[in-house]
A protein has these predicted regions:
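Hydrophobic alpha-helical transmembrane segments
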Residues: 48-51, 229-233, 300-308
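C-terminal cap/substrate-recognition subdomain and adjoining C-terminal extension
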Residues: 2-23, 84-234
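Alpha-helical transmembrane segments of integral membrane proteins
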Residues: 44, 219-223, 238-249, 289-293, ...
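Membrane-embedded alpha-helical segments that form the functional core of polytopic membrane enzymes
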Residues: 226, 236-264
Length: 308
């Protein structure tokens, strides 16, 4: 048994959402924010808002990076604002936290996100008795977060996280709560520490990408082939090839535009009863992945247009 476990509490390691403690735990539960409490990354959320509302600050980003991670996060947070009210939260995990809170368990938010964001989330949810977060001088991640937890909470705690960056904290904890953790990382955690609960991450389905790319809108670009039909040139292989490349170029450019627009409208989409379920608004697809795919689609569209 983990030597950091209180003797009156028995933990069970296990697999799947059913892995649980066999007795109600009174050990403080320390919770991560990005990727755990919410599937999104609040730094990228803030960066998108900065680009949208303060585009001239882009020229200052390289200088902000020279300040280190803590300084960069502070710069982004200072020049942007995201609403904690409409962030996408992991509902199953949130329900678990509320259940534990109702039973008198101490719950602490410990995150590498900037303190301004963490405090907004804490105020909105009303679950946390203490907030530990990054500030202008310290980036609270990995071993730095572990040190802060030990100083504020003590050596006995359960930690809820989502990534390999949390491994040092899990190793020092009494037990782990795994939220959306990759199978390989989860296996490493189970080898070293008992697991209190697991909340598996839903897989990213192919149809989610189809929705994000708005592939159904590509049908409009089939109008490019109409001149071939009216000129009875639909059997001309060279012209068909040219139109096919043009079709793909237009379609990829349109998809990139739709994705950028969705990222631009994240906060407003989350307040809409239907749009809040879109892939980016619901954080089914991470922001940085969306930006990369949109950029790739634009590059491919440009390259194809050269040959049309």
């Amino acid at each position: 048994m983990n030597d950091r476990m209180p003797p009156n509490i028995e933990y069970q390691s296990g697999h799947g959402a059913g892995a649980a403690v066999s007795a109600e735990s009174t050990v403080p539960l320390v919770v991560d924010l990005d990727g755990t409490l919410t599937p999104t990354d609040t730094l990228f959320e803030s960066l998108v808002q900065l680009l949208k509302h303060s585009p001239m600050q882009i020229i200052r980003l390289p200088l902000a990076l020279l300040r280190g991670r803590a300084g960069f996060k502070h710069f982004i947070a200072t020049h942007s604002s995201i609403s904690a009210d409409y962030l996408p939260y992991r509902q199953d995990f949130l329900d678990y936290l509320r259940e534990q809170k109702s039973k008198g368990r101490r719950i602490i938010l410990a995150t590498a996100a900037h303190e301004s964001i963490a405090n907004k989330v804490a105020a909105h949810l009303g679950l946390f008795e203490t907030v530990l977060a990054s500030n202008p001088d310290h980036n609270l991640k990995g071993t730095a977060k572990l040190q802060a937890i030990r100083e504020q909470i003590g050596p006995v705690f359960v930690y809820a996280g989502d990534s390999s960056a949390d491994l040092p904290i899990w190793r020092a904890s009494s037990a782990a709560v795994l939220v959306g953790v990759a199978p390989a990382v989860a296996a490493r955690v189970r080898e070293e520490v008992a697991v209190e609960r697991e909340f598996p991450k839903a897989g990213l389905e192919f149809k989610t990408w189809l929705r994000a790319l708005r592939v159904h809108q590509w049908l409009k670009n089939l109008l490019l082939f109409v001149p071939l039909l009216t000129a009875f040139s639909f059997l001309d292989v060279e012209k068909l090839t040219t139109m096919a490349v043009a079709f793909l170029a237009f379609s990829l450019a349109a998809s990139a535009t739709y994705m950028v627009n969705d990222l631009w409208d994240l906060q407003s989409d989350r307040q809409h009863p239907r749009k809040r379920f879109r892939p980016f608004a619901s954080a089914q697809i991470p922001i940085h992945i969306g930006l990369a795919v949109a950029a790739l689609a634009l590059v491919l569209s440009f390259v194809m247009s050269v040959f049309v």
